[in-house]
Amino acid sequence: MYLCNKVVKIMQAVVHNNLEQEFQAKIDADIRIEPKDWMPEAYRKTLIRQISQHAHSEIVGMLPEGNWITRAPSLRRKVALIAKVQDEAGHGLYLYAAAETLGIDRDTLLEELHTGKAKYSSIFNYPTTTWADMGAIGWLVDGAAIMNQVPLCRTSYGPYARAMVRVCKEESFHQRQGYEIMLALSKGSEEQKRMAQDAFNRWWWPSLMMFGPSDAESQHSEQSMKWRIKRFTNDELRQRFVDITVPQAEFLGLTVPDPDLKWNEERG
């Protein structure tokens, strides 16, 4: 009996190893993984953690902006902000649906959010004290989100990748809306210009933190890159965001709140 059990365990290990090799071969060939496909348990758990955190962030992200719907400076601004908050709710629902394809139910996801077991982006805990914050959030926070999320349209898990296509299109609208608010303020009175600079000062660093820890300190990046859940490292995406955002700030006449930021001639 002991020998039989030992043989069974060896055979199970061989089968599991073969399945993992076939799985990684599909990943390496850029073949998407679908819900009915075999996947390592660690891959499934990693996706649940990432997708649920993403979904929670979309839902919680409605709160600081919803706060300003009744205080928007014009009917046009109010309608645009309502549309944006509505989009964020939809993004959360798409992502919860994607997470459910991995075998976890929505009630469990929400329970983990409410009990604090699950995380969401801490940037949404920062106060929104002026209307300029609505511009800075759209421009910087949604801009950072786009930088993170566009590569997810090519992530290895099919339902997540397909959900991200629509999410990214709508986030692009949000980013343009925020930048347009900042542009209007930068062309306004001296008080409005100061308001825009103040919002930029407060949201610049939290936006950079949205890309996660540095590559050397990231616990998950290496494996997520191997599985092609992620396509680029945290530091690569953060650098791209800086390269794109600094010229936009200069066009607005704003000063980047980092005296150590310099142009790298060697990188170009």
Please report, for each region that a protein language model flagged, where it lies by residue:
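Acidic/His metal-coordination segments adjacent to aromatic residues that form catalytic metal sites
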Residues: 32-52, 112-138, 155, 188-192, ...
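Extended, helix-rich structural scaffolds rather than catalytic motifs
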Residues: 193-268
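Conserved alpha-helical segments that form or flank metal/cofactor-binding pockets of metalloenzymes
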Residues: 12-22, 79, 84-112, 179-183
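Helix-loop segments that flank and shape redox-cofactor active sites
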Residues: 37-43, 60-83, 145-160
